[in-house]
UniProtKB/Swiss-Prot annotation:
Keyword Nucleus set for record: yes
UniProt region (Disordered), positions on chain: 437-475, 492-571, 609-643
PANTHER family: PESCADILLO - RELATED, PESCADILLO HOMOLOG
Stored InterPro entries: BRCT_dom, BRCT_dom_sf, PES
Location, primary (coarse class): nucleus
Keyword Lyase: no
Lineage: Eukaryota, Metazoa, Ecdysozoa, Arthropoda, Hexapoda
Coiled-coil portions: 569-643
Domain BRCT positions: 319-412
Keywords: Coiled coil, Nucleus, Ribosome biogenesis, rRNA processing
GO molecular-function term, one example from the UniProt record: RNA binding
Protein name: Pescadillo homolog
GO biological process, one term: maturation of 5.8S rRNA from tricistronic rRNA transcript (SSU-rRNA, 5.8S rRNA, LSU-rRNA)
Compositional bias of kind Basic and acidic residues: 492-518, 609-635
Length: 643
């Protein structure tokens, strides 16, 4: 007898578990199941045919892949979560009997989760962990600003603060910071670590305000925080040893004073959090970083067309690392201390602040060697002539443009220029005019400081990158010009062939041989512009030799005259119609299995065009309003002068 195939026992119907079935399989409640999935990186799946995956049901359910649930069955943490359930029941039982000693003993023996093997399992290589460092640092920086609550414990907030300070010290020592930006969400930082870009957000330092429970589930965020603290500890350890720094961080010199005698650990942690001290190195060197030597490419640029761009980018990054070298900054009390200290230290500058503001100040406000004082107030009573009083935005804009900007636009009380985001694409559809001006200024400086590569093959002609890659618009114009020229030449040839016989009959027999030869050459030559100009020059020379009275009359055929060509201009309406027809044709040529993806790409392009158009219109309205306000202001000033 043939074995019968039952429905939903194979194929897509046997590939998925619902969340309830997965919890029953693992014998866990919803809280532990969520925590386990977060730690292991298991997420719900979307089946191709939901009705088949749910055994005929069309209800929207959370589905997990059967292989993922089978993978969780072999996880040792599952046993720890089950033991926690038993301990929770025993602790409640001891508290109900008011046996506090037994309750404390069971709390002390409460099973702890060990996540080391999960970190190694999810990130087999160190570069894989660096790629996932964005969310890790963003969450830890947020937890470091939280107070201790019932869910977010004090131990988690302290560990988050320690790990973030250690990470900032590494970025300072490695000079890895590349981009900074201020937004309503916080401070954006982007660093280049081991060839990977890491972007994280530091929230603004405002007082903590509790939220409603339905807005954010802090228990889920705590699960992420527990995993990210273990992960960040491993990463900081590897990063510190990669640049020969001692981990955990220590001071490069001893601090024997009355303050350290009381609580040395607290004193050292505060000084490290100040971000203003050099850390101890394992190789015994000082904190000064040596400038890396740029190796010149001695081969042909034809083999690697982007060598010049790579070389220029390396030079720009090398200059950026020492942007604030030789400058001394002093921070006023009203400006945010930690982000500014972090940025200035990353680019080689020296910084200090008021001693009553935070520990770790190295010089006072009265120091005459201070070059810049960062303030955020309209005016100050006492000012020093030897320094510039600037607003904090100058530091951020100088880093993003990779040059020291003029300070006159950032003076105390001045209206600041727009703060442009560095996280934009070069091929963006809308670019603000201020950003275009900044790009032109940067390109002008790069042209002044050109780099001359080593010449090895001087015999071969060097072709620059601009010559190799032609502009598509210029190429199209050249093609249009060539087509129009060919059309005019063909039309002139046809006219000449029809009038050639009549021109031969009209020739005069009394002309001399020189005029006949000139006429024959004129009839036989082509109608190219260059050759006609040569013939005209020869004719003018002969006319100068002959007397004025014997000047011959030219009997060239009328068809030989050069006519001015008309410039072809496209009709915008017809062009739009043709573009729509081509787009419809491309959509028909897309295969059925790729149509959904193609429609998404088309919608994305339309959305980008719409956003660019809206931004351009908004900018135009703002500029128009500014001009109207300026005109109104000028009118009022004129009235006041006349009055």
């Amino acid at each position: 007898m043939v074995k019968r195939n039952h429905k939903f026992k194979s194929g897509e119907g046997a590939m998925y578990y619902t969340r309830k079935a997965a919890m029953n399989k693992l014998q866990l409640n919803i809280k532990d199941f969520r925590q386990l999935c977060i730690l292991k990186g298991i997420y719900p799946r979307e089946p191709k045919h939901r009705a088949r995956a749910q055994h005929g049901s069309r209800e929207m359910k959370i589905l997990y892949h059967k292989k993922d649930i089978t993978f969780l069955l072999h996880e040792p943490i599952v046993w720890t979560l089950r033991d926690r359930k038993i301990f929770n029941r025993r602790i409640k039982h001891a508290a109900a009997k008011q046996n506090m000693n037994l309750r404390d003993i069971r709390l002390h023996n409460y099973p702890q989760l060990k996540l080391d093997h999960i970190v190694k399992e999810r990130y087999p290589t160190f570069i894989d962990a660096i790629k996932e460092l964005d969310d890790c640092m963003t969450l830890l920086f947020m937890f470091s600003t939280f107070p201790a609550t019932k869910i977010i414990t004090r131990e988690l907030t302290r560990m988050s603060r320690r790990l973030t300070v250690e990470f900032m010290h590494y970025v300072i020592a490695a000079q890895a910071l590349r981009k900074v930006f201020i937004s309503i969400k916080g401070y954006y930082f982007q660093a280049e670590i081991k060839g990977e870009t890491v972007t994280w957000i530091v929230p603004h330092y405002f007082p903590y305000s509790p939220h409603r429970g339905e807005m954010v589930d802090l228990s889920i965020m705590k699960s992420f925080g527990d995993f990210f603290t273990v992960m960040a500890g491993f990463i900081n350890y590897r990063l510190y040893h990669s640049i020969n720094l001692v981990y955990p961080p220590q001071f490069a010199h001893s601090l024997d004073s009355d303050e350290t005698m009381g609580n040395e650990q607290k004193f050292v942690s505060e000084r490290i959090a100040a971000l203003n001290v050099e850390l101890l190195r394992s190789d015994g060197g000082n904190g000064d970083t040596e400038e890396p030597e740029l190796l010149e490419w001695t081969g042909n640029d034809e083999e690697l067309p982007h060598v010049s761009q790579i070389r220029q980018e390396a030079q720009n990054v090398n200059k950026l690392k020492t942007l604030f070298k030789g400058l001394k900054f002093f921070l006023n009390r009203e400006v945010p201390r930690e982000p500014l200290v972090f940025i200035i230290r990353c680019f080689g500058g020296k910084v200090s602040w008021d001693k009553t503001m935070f520990v770790g100040a190295t010089f006072d406000e009265s120091d005459e060697t201070i070059t810049h004082q960062i303030v955020d107030r309209p005016s100050m009573e006492k000012q020093h002539i030897s320094r510039d009083y600037i607003q904090p935005q100058w530091v951020f804009d100088s880093v993003n443009q990779r040059r020291l900007l003029p300070t006159n636009k950032y003076f105390m009380g001045a209206v600041l220029p727009p703060h442009l985001s560095p996280f934009t694409s070069a091929n963006a559809r809308y670019v603000p005019p201020e950003e275009l001006a900044a790009r032109k200024a940067a390109e002008g400086e790069e042209e002044e400081e050109t780099f001359e590569p080593a010449e090895v093959n001087a015999d071969h002609e060097h072709i620059s990158d601009d010559e190799e890659v032609q502009d598509p618009e210029n190429e199209q114009e050249m093609q249009d010009y060539a087509l129009m020229k060919a059309f005019n030449d063909e039309r002139t040839d046809s006219l000449n062939s029809g009038k050639k016989e009549g021109a031969d009959d009209a020739t005069d027999n009394g002309k001399d041989a020189a005029e006949k030869k000139q006429q024959q050459n004129g009839d036989g030559e082509s109608d190219d512009e260059d050759e006609e100009e040569e013939d005209d020059d020869d004719g003018e020379e002969e006319e100068d030799v002959m007397p004025k009275k014997q000047k011959p009359v030219s009997n060239k055929p009328k068809g030989m005259a050069v006519r001015r060509g008309t410039v072809y201009r496209e009709n915008e309406a017809e062009k739009k119609i043709v573009d729509k027809q081509e787009e419809a044709l491309r959509a028909r040529m897309v295969k059925s299995r790729h149509r959904k993806l193609y429609s998404k790409l088309v919608e994305r392009e339309k959305k980008a065009d719409k956003n660019a158009r809206l931004l351009a219109n908004k900018r135009e309205r703002i500029e128009k309003q500014k001009r109207a306000e300026q005109m109104e202001k000028q009118k009022q000033q004129r009235k006041q002068i006349l009055a």
